[in-house]
């Protein structure tokens, strides 16, 4: 059956969601389209006394939490190539008028959203939480650009500042330099350089330039918010809230406010709040400057209407300018709260509806053994299917605005992909992503545990030329939009607790910012000395010729070099936990244990993100009592549940986890728990980890930066640590 997660008071939240190749599931009130997942009877159990089994079963169930919702995914077909832009202009020349446009699959006739910026509509207050099974449903007409600007006015009269990164990057860039850089980007010509930094490894990557100096210094350092060029209202707010920036904020602020693509790999629970404040400040500043520039230029055009040569290029195809990709509704609520605190806006339209849909006021019921990062991620409403449009006017914030009327789009990857529709349903729509100028992905390490395919799909559809006009005034659209170069001006900011090949690939394939890219990540001390118990740790390197051949080489090494040590002394194999990061590898190993004659002497059980709670409790019980000597356990299951496994005497890492905290929890936590239960003598536990040269990022975080080079290049392939 589909992936499961917590429900109940979390507002239908669900976690997990299959392997990287499968999607996450439905939202509140949804249904499983595909029915139950076929069961694979994979366990092999040895006979034991029933009494001991029941006793251990009750112990295992104490740590289980029953999910109340299940999820499945809709696969979305790829879009056909877009038509040439000149054909688009011809098709739009007839005029489109005002359209009623929805980004949902079902109509909602019971709710209408008003445009009064000072109050909530009665329809919004009276609408049920689960209208048509979709709490994020919006049904309102798409506004024309001119109509939008007639309702608003600039909040100050600041003039153009040539030192302002907003002007130098978007409004008035050096066209010759930008053209040269874009040409280099098109030819995949980049130059990388490591910048001096005390707290992190900072790598600057710039498009190659003929006359560029090798002494590129990177972004100008930012020590406090007072040095930033911000809208006055935002500057007053941030200087009162945060007059000085700490080291982590300074590292991010410099590339962030100077519009570099940024991969920041030092996000923690401790600094997450401050980093969230910075990205919200940057997003709001960008939106307000864009809005005020358009309003001022519109006023000038109205005043000088007799001048036919007067022209202002200050808009995109559509209104949304910022996209925030977030893992859960609760993380979205934290972003919204931060924006409200920075804007200090009292008038918030549809606020009650937002609180009802995104904020869980009931006290969380986490067991005492859940770690801090788990609580931070899954507290509140942990539903991972949502999308929200937010519109800002001079005095009002409107939640649940229609996407084409919004300034900021906040969504989970699954929620946004569902909003984009599919070619199968003939409702594919991604025009609202055509003019995104800033993408912010927060808690990317958590999004990696969802369906990364959705993230790739979204990035592939960013900054494409739209299929419809959406009321745009083409005489006001910036030239680089019309030339199909908007992706070269878009800034992408990714915040994660660690780097990962998928994150690096997004930066390599989808980030074409002419300003350049910056990667910030720390040097690691490693966690092998932080287990809290004395245990022998053996790291075994195997050879894989290519990254494509790595899964096969890993499997062959496992069954030929690791499993024989278990089958030769079956009695000593009791309490063996096999940790498998990839679900595809998990299926392969599970099937081999179930069908291979070489494994017939080994009883085994399985726990994955797809395993039902009753089966999980049974597997844990059999493992504790010894009826199942080997337990196969996946990384994503541990991410979503953090099971406190008992009876572990030996840990085998089929692959190292992305998150180094998991290594410490599995190796140190499980073996330490066995010593506390006096089922394992101190110092008798063991850990064996398999790795190849393609695991360099994972290995560095586990063993430490100083050791990783030697372990990858030395002649020996076995490394022991005590």
From Swiss-Prot:
Annotated stretches, region: Disordered: 1-168
GO-annotated molecular function: rRNA binding; U3 snoRNA binding
Bias kind Basic and acidic residues: ranges: 38-51
Subcellular location: Nucleus, Nucleolus
Highest taxon in the source lineage: Eukaryota
Protein's UniProt keywords contain Zinc: no
InterPro entries with a match to the protein in the record: P-loop_NTPase, UTP25, UTP25_C, UTP25_NTPase-like
GO biological process: maturation of SSU-rRNA from tricistronic rRNA transcript (SSU-rRNA, 5.8S rRNA, LSU-rRNA)
UniProt biased composition (Gly residues): 1-20
Family: Belongs to the UTP25 family.
Function, in words: DEAD-box RNA helicase-like protein required for pre-18S rRNA processing, specifically at sites A0, A1, and A2.
Protein name per the record: U3 small nucleolar RNA-associated protein 25
Taxonomic classification: Eukaryota, Fungi, Dikarya, Ascomycota, Pezizomycotina
Gene: UTP25
């Amino acid at each position: 059956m589909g992936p499961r997660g917590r429900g109940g008071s979390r507002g239908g939240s669900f976690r997990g969601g299959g392997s990287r190749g499968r999607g996450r599931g439905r939202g509140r009130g949804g249904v499983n389209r595909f029915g139950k997942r076929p069961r694979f009877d994979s366990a092999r159990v040895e006979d034991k006394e029933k009494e001991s089994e029941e006793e251990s079963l009750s112990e295992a169930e104490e740590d289980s939490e029953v999910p109340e919702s299940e999820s499945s995914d809709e696969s979305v077909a790829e879009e056909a190539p877009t038509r040439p832009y000149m054909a688009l202009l011809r098709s739009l020349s007839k005029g489109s008028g005002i359209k009623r446009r929805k980004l949902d699959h079902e109509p909602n006739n019971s709710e209408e959203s008003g445009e009064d910026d000072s109050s909530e509509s009665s329809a919004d207050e009276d609408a049920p939480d689960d209208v048509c099974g979709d709490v994020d449903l919006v049904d309102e007409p798409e506004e024309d650009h001119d109509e939008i600007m007639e309702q608003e006015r600039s909040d100050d009269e600041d003039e153009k500042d040539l030192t302002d990164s907003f002007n130098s990057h978007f409004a008035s860039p050096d066209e010759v330099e930008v053209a040269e850089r874009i040409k280099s980007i098109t030819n995949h010509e980049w130059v990388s350089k490591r910048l001096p930094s005390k707290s992190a490894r900072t790598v600057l990557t710039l498009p190659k330039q003929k006359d560029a100096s090798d002494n590129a210094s990177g972004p100008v350092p930012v020590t406090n918010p007072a040095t930033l060029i911000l809208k006055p209202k935002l500057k007053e707010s941030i200087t009162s809230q945060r007059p000085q920036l700490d080291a982590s904020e300074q590292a991010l602020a410099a590339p962030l406010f100077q519009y570099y693509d940024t991969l920041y790999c030092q996000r923690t629970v401790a600094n997450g709040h401050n980093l969230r404040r910075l990205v919200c400040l940057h997003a709001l500043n960008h939106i307000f400057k864009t809005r005020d520039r358009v309003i001022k230029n519109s006023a000038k055009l109205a005043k000088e209407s007799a001048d036919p040569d007067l022209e202002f290029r200050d808009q995109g195809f559509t209104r949304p300018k910022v996209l925030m990709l977030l893992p859960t509704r609760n993380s979205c609520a934290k972003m919204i709260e931060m924006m409200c605190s920075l804007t200090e806006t009292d008038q918030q339209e549809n606020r009650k509806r937002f609180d009802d849909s995104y904020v869980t006021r009931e006290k969380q019921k986490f067991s005492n053994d859940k770690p801090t990062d788990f609580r931070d991620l899954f507290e509140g409403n942990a539903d991972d299917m949502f999308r929200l449009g937010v519109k800002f006017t001079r005095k009002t914030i409107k939640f649940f605005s229609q996407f084409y009327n919004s300034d900021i789009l906040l969504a989970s990857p699954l929620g946004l992909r569902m909003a984009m529709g599919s070619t199968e349903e003939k409702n594919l729509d991604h025009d609202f992503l055509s003019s995104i100028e800033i993408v912010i992905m927060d808690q990317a390490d958590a999004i990696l545990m969802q369906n990364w395919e959705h993230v790739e799909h979204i990035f592939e559809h960013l900054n494409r030329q739209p299929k419809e006009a959406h009321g745009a005034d083409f005489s006001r659209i910036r030239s680089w939009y019309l030339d199909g170069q908007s992706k070269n001006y878009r800034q992408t900011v990714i915040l994660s607790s660690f780097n990962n090949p998928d994150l690096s690939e997004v930066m390599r394939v989808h980030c074409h910012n002419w300003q350049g890219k910056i990667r910030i990540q720390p040097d690691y001390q490693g966690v092998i000395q932080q287990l809290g118990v004395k245990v022998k740790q053996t790291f075994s390197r195997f050879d894989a010729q290519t990254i494509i051949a790595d899964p096969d080489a890993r499997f062959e090494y496992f069954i030929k070099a690791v499993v024989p040590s278990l089958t030769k002394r079956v009695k000593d194999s009791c309490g063996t936990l096999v940790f498998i990061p990839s679900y595809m590898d998990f299926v392969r190993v599970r099937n081999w244990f179930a069908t291979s004659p070489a494994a017939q002497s080994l009883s085994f059980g399985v726990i994955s993100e797809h395993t039902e709670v009753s089966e999980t409790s049974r597997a844990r019980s059999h493992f504790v009592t010894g009826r199942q000597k080997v337990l196969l356990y996946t990384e994503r299951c541990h991410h979503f549940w953090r099971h406190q496994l008992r009876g572990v005497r030996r840990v085998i890492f089929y692959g190292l986890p992305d998150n180094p905290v998991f290594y410490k929890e599995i190796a140190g936590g499980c073996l330490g728990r066995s010593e506390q239960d006096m089922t394992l003598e101190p110092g008798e536990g063991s850990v064996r980890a398999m790795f190849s040269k393609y695991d360099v990022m994972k290995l560095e975080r586990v063993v430490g930066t100083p050791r990783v080079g030697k372990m990858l290049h030395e002649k020996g392939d076995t490394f022991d640590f005590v």
